Design a protein with these regions (language model features):
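Amphipathic alpha-helical packing elements
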Residues: 47-89
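Amphipathic protein-protein interaction modules
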Residues: 72, 76-129
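Broad hydrophobic/π-residue packing in well-ordered secondary structure
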Residues: 31-32, 61-65, 69, 93, ...
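Polar/charged low-complexity regulatory segments
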Residues: 3-49, 110-152
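Short coil/turn linker and secondary-structure boundary residues
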Residues: 2, 30, 53-56, 67, ...
Length: 152
């Protein structure tokens, strides 16, 4: 059952701050914590310029786990905290093999733009010059967000 008041207490105001890095884990998955932040902000409308869905980062997580954006949003809407959301993510993921999850996490951490889908590469071609400092090189996909949001 949705509990937007509880969601508001957990939500970061993304008009004033950044979501967590895609490198931060939730439930053993990179990208998970960032998805939670963006979804929690989306529900009460304090997501600013951040999209919960569609999002290429979230798409990677949802594709790997087999969880849909709507399923994730329904759980977040209950006011689930990080621990509860992590437990749900672990239980609902189609991937239960810990070694496969570790390998996927490492693949995501090392993912280069040239390895991304063509539409993501095209999007990043315009996005990076607008939002990433020109003197900072992007080595892997996660760098785009960590540079833009001043974590690197």
């Amino acid at each position: 059952m949705p509990d937007l008041e509880k969601v508001r207490t957990l939500a970061k105001d993304l008009t004033k701050t950044y979501p967590r890095s895609p490198r931060e884990m939730l439930g053993g998955y990179v990208i998970g914590a960032r998805c939670a932040d963006k979804c929690r902000a989306f529900l009460p409308g304090i997501n600013g310029d951040y999209n919960y869905w569609p999002c290429s980062l979230a798409g990677l997580l949802f594709s790997f786990t087999g969880i849909t954006p709507e399923q994730f949003k329904e759980v977040v809407a209950t006011g689930a905290n990080d621990e509860e959301l992590a437990a749900w993510l672990k239980a609902q993921s189609k991937v239960q093999d810990q070694q496969a999850i570790i390998q996927w996490n490492n693949k995501m951490r090392d993912l280069r733009l040239s390895e991304m889908a063509p539409q993501v590469q095209a999007y990043m071609e315009d996005y990076i010059p607008k939002y990433v400092p020109s003197h900072r090189p992007v080595y892997v996909y996660f760098d785009v967000y960590d540079l833009e949001e001043k974590r690197l």
